[in-house]
């Protein structure tokens, strides 16, 4: 395939490839596990993560988008490299735009969701919960008078469990008491999640974007070290707004301009 030489060619190229998407994989080596977006192959001493073009929402695969897998995988690769001073990660090699070879890890059954703004449209989003009258969420106290899409006084960690059918919000206290993680591991991971998010916000703002919220996953490698895994700061795992127009749109009671999969969530 020919390379895209400038951003003005993106739309044209995507249109030509609309029927040429990576929907599924089938390799003879390794034990295959199929996720909503990624296919994972467990090899002898590592795993191969193949990011497809599948588009998911509300735990369902809805469609496919040309080059989506490449965007997600290469975005993660960039951020993994830029954040390794905060926490090591599972990446061994990026042999293809859609593929990451990674360390085998024992994954913590908790997703570390960090939020900088009160927003969202799903049943577990901070705004939905707040608008329904709750003033405590995942162990965080919420003040009266917050408005949708408002910046929080400080970044907030709202963890969820990783369960087969549906994740559920959980407090740090319950994470430890229910045995999801040890207190020591939780303290370390929660600290790193907040550090990663602060760095992500700073970097995004330098590039004209607001990193609104995101999720991280972590696990222990074969040496017992805690590492960052899965993906980081992608349009699938994160919410991004355009910084330049944010204040004016809030003043005019308009939704912020977003560049993530929130549009598909709202549509559904």
Which positions does each model-derived feature cover?
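Coil-to-beta-strand transition motifs
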Residues: 107-109, 207-211, 222-226
């Amino acid at each position: 395939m020919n390379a895209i030489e400038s951003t003005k060619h993106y739309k044209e190229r995507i249109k030509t490839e609309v029927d040429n998407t990576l929907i599924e994989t089938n390799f003879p080596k390794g034990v295959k596990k199929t996720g909503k977006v990624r296919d994972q192959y467990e090899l002898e001493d590592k795993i191969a993560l193949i990011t497809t073009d599948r588009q998911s929402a509300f735990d369902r695969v809805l469609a496919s988008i040309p080059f989506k897998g490449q965007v997600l995988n290469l975005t993660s690769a960039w951020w993994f490299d830029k954040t390794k001073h905060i926490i090591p990660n599972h990446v061994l090699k990026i042999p293809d735009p859609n593929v990451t070879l990674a360390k085998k890890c024992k994954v913590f059954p908790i997703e570390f969701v960090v939020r900088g703004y009160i927003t969202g449209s799903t049943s577990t989003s901070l705004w939905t919960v707040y608008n329904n009258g709750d003033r405590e969420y995942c162990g965080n106290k919420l003040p009266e008078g917050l408005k949708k899409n408002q910046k929080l006084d400080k970044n907030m960690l709202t963890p969820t469990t990783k369960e087969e059918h549906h994740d559920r919000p959980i407090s740090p206290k319950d994470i430890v008491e229910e045995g999801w993680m040890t207190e020591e591991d939780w303290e370390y991971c929660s600290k790193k999640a907040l550090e990663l998010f602060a760095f992500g916000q700073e970097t995004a703002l330098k590039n004209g974007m607001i990193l609104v919220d995101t999720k991280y996953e972590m696990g222990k490698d074969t040496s017992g070290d805690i590492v960052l895994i899965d993906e980081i700061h992608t349009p699938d795992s994160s919410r991004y707004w355009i910084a330049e127009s944010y204040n004016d749109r809030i003043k005019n009671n308009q939704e912020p301009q977003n560049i993530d999969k929130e549009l598909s969530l709202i549509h559904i």
